Curated annotation (Swiss-Prot):
This is tRNA pseudouridine synthase B. It is an enzyme of class 5 (isomerase). InterPro entries: PsdUridine_synth_cat_dom_sf, PsdUridine_synth_N, tRNA_psdUridine_synth_TruB, TruB_C. Transmembrane segments: none annotated.
Length: 301
């Protein structure tokens, strides 16, 4: 029997402007097929109905996803005031309604409570695990559960538009684990009018901006052609939050073999997590100690 082709060794980031109606995993699988890549992943799940920035990692770029966990993410979204739903978005069954509509001043006054280090309860329809089962599976089966509040850092929450009395547009910048649907739900409760997300768009993740993203249709149109390579962003972009240390050829060779390698002087302290580069190409991520980088993750680039 002929051996199945496992794909090509392609490494880099593809910044996809995710369309509504697809899961993040489905987008990753499509991109992987288009590039015929061996390995693929993504940095941060978007709900199926959400659009916007979905950074897709190919090959060695998948090793950098873990170092993006502290990256901030930005979202714009519209809240429908006066209605709560089972899913906290427009797809869910309506639970409660209210004729109350807050003023612009009341909305602005409520926002500071959602900024800083806060506690947030995930939506019932979320990927949070409860006794080994996904919350959304329990919810779809008609079950209800009390989900524990989680720590969340929120950089900012601000009004960017008020189309009419029933709607308000917001921008939300947060750390890992934030749920926009929970913000809409909780803001509606604080304002005494209920609320849910009408639409949601992610505009940036860490160093990745939606202005640099391409539509999935563009990726599919170029599938299995050399023109796709022009869409690849460097692997090292995901390491922007870590100090970069340059290495010599000899140091790079040691690091690639999993051994501590000498690095050139840089803005780093003993024990800091940093990444080593040779001519701008990532070699390894590790801890800096006395002129050497002790590798924790090595790149085959």
């Amino acid at each position: 029997m002929a051996r199945r082709n496992k794909g090509r060794d392609i490494s880099g980031w593809v910044l996809v402007d995710k369309p509504a109606g697809l899961t993040s995993t489905a987008v990753v699988n499509k991109v992987r097929w288009c590039f015929d890549a061996k390995k693929a992943g993504h940095a941060g799940t978007l709900d199926p109905d959400a659009t916007g920035m979905l950074p897709v990692a190919l090959g060695e770029a998948t090793k950098t996803i873990a170092y993006m966990s502290d990256d901030l993410k930005a979202y714009t979204f519209r809240v429908r005031l006066g209605v709560s739903t089972k899913t906290d978005d427009a797809e869910g069954e309506v639970l409660e309604t209210s004729d109350t509509r807050p003023t612009d001043t009341e909305i602005e006054a409520a926002l500071p409570a959602f900024v800083g280090d806060i506690q947030q309860v995930p939506p019932q329809f979320s990927a949070v695990k409860v006794d080994g089962e996904r919350a959304y599976d329990i919810a779809r089966g008609g079950g209800e559960m009390e989900l524990a509040a989680r720590d969340l850092y929120v950089e900012s929450l601000s009004v960017i538009g008020r189309p009419d009395a029933d709607h308000v547009d917001l921008e939300f910048v947060c750390g890992s684990g934030g749920y926009v649907r929970s913000i809409a739900r909780d803001l509606g409760q604080v304002l005494g009018c209920f609320g849910h997300v009408l639409w949601l768009r992610r505009t940036w993740v860490g160093a990745f901006d939606i202005e640099d993203a391409v539509g999935l249709d563009r990726v599919e149109a170029l599938a299995r052609t050399d023109a796709l390579y022009a869409l690849l962003q460097p692997v090292g972009l995901a390491l922007h939050a870590l100090p970069e240390l340059r290495v010599t050829d000899a140091g790079a060779a040691r690091l690639r073999n999993g051994n501590p390698g000498g690095v050139l002087p840089g803005n780093v302290e003993y024990g800091d997590l940093a990444w080593a580069s040779l001519n701008g190409t990532p070699v390894a991520v590790g801890r800096y100690r006395s002129g050497e980088l002790h590798p924790e993750r090595v790149f085959n680039l």
